[in-house]
Amino acid sequence: MNETQIQRETRQVVEDVLEKTNLKQGALFVLGLSSSEVLGGQIGKESSQEIGELIVETILGILSSRGIHLAVQGCEHVNRALVVERQVAEQFGLEIVSVHPTLHAGGSGQLAAFKFMQDPVEVEFIKAHAGLDIGDTAIGMHVKHVQVPIRPILREIGHAHVTALASRPKLIGGARAHYPQDAIRKS
């Protein structure tokens, strides 16, 4: 697999999702990543630390330049815990848990987050404003309600299926209620 192509596709998708979700500085962005799927394998079976590092470093650079916080979801072997910066955990009141990821428990994305973040910790649960799922890792449990599917400009990064979610405030009220236009639902 061509690493330059994977990096280009990752950058394209992330910038597109950020444009469509209109995330603001200080927002939380969750990443689910299967490096196995990116390489054309089955999720969890052919993990690649190099691919994890390439993708996480690319995304972290884009988000950091905009003041958006990255949370990297692990696999079910770590109960889908997430790696965030300690400052983010403290700012959002997130519960820190004790686990250190490995390639096959947490995954390549989490290992990369531990490498590239300044003071990484694992947290049990977040309510992100939006997120990107590379390889059908199921990020929905970590995106706050109400979730809105976002169609990225590309449907795959490498060989991995790509989806994205944003969130919007709940619409409450009844027949008489009026709702302001939000940044995601343009009409």
From Swiss-Prot:
It holds the Pfam family DUF436. It comes from the Bacteria. InterPro entries: Antibiotic_NAT-like, DUF436. SUPFAM superfamilies: TTHA0583/YokD-like. Belongs to the UPF0340 family. This is UPF0340 protein SP70585_0722. It comes from Streptococcus pneumoniae (strain 70585).
